[in-house]
Structure formats: structure tokens, C-alpha cells
Amino acid sequence: QIKGKLSANQIEGDIVKTVSKSFPRTNSYASGTITVRISDDQKFDRQVMIPPVLFRGGKHENFNSNNQQSYWYSTCRLRVTRNGQEIFNQSTTDVQGVFSSVIDMPAGQGTLTLTFTVSSSGANDWTPTTSISDLLVVVMKKSTAGISIS
């Protein structure tokens, strides 16, 4: 048991740090921003992995005064930036959207900031129904120690 801080830069093996967070919601739809900041506080290169984030809007049934059936759609949009530069921007209705990424983080290049913004809208300004999975961020030392792929 270690009480306090342990610092080591020549570890044999793997060190992985993971953090997860749910996207903000307003009643029936996803709406809000998650900002991830990864400090450049290590002397080795790292990789940041974002496992798949799944998001979707929806298709809704509607009947008019003559009892005629029609449909309207909820739209869910996910926008992702890396240090202020857009790397992903997609909207979807009733088909699932997916974002996933592996980002190199060389040592000495400063803090990495990822911003994930989800927004929702409904046709005719109706209240949308959308969903998005939790965000998982995995940070690891960039190394092939003990792994061979051929």
C-alpha cells in the first residue's frame, strides 16, 4: 500500500487511466458539453482512446385531425473538437451515429483539450427524444512493450 504520490517513468508493463462521464440531459433529450483536459505532465508519449460513443435521434408517429398518419423526426448532433479544431460533426435522426478515435499525445506539446457537444432538436420545434451513450476516455503510455503483432 502506497500512501501519497508515486512517480515512475521507467515502468515495465502497462499503465492505463480511464475516466467516464454521462452526457447532460434535459428531460427526454441529450443536450450539453463535456470538456476533457489531459495535462502534458509526463515525460513519455501517450495515446488517448475514445471507445465508441453511440448517439441517435428518433422517428415519431403523428396523426392529424383527419386521422392521417405522418412522421416527424428528432435529430441528435455530436460535435467534437481537439484543441479548438473540429474533428467530428455529425447529426442523425433514426439511424445510430458513432464517434470513436485514437489520438496521439507526444510529450512536451502541451495540454490536450477535447470538447464534446451534444445537441438535440425536433421538427416543428417539438420536444425531441434523443439518446447518447456515456463518454469513456482511456489514456495510456504509447508503447509496444510485450506486444507483437504480425
Language-model regions, residue ranges each:
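Low-complexity, small-hydrophobic/phenylalanine-enriched stretches
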Residues: 1-12, 16-17, 22
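Extracellular jelly-roll beta-sandwich "head" domains, especially the C-terminal globular C1q domain
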Residues: 18-150
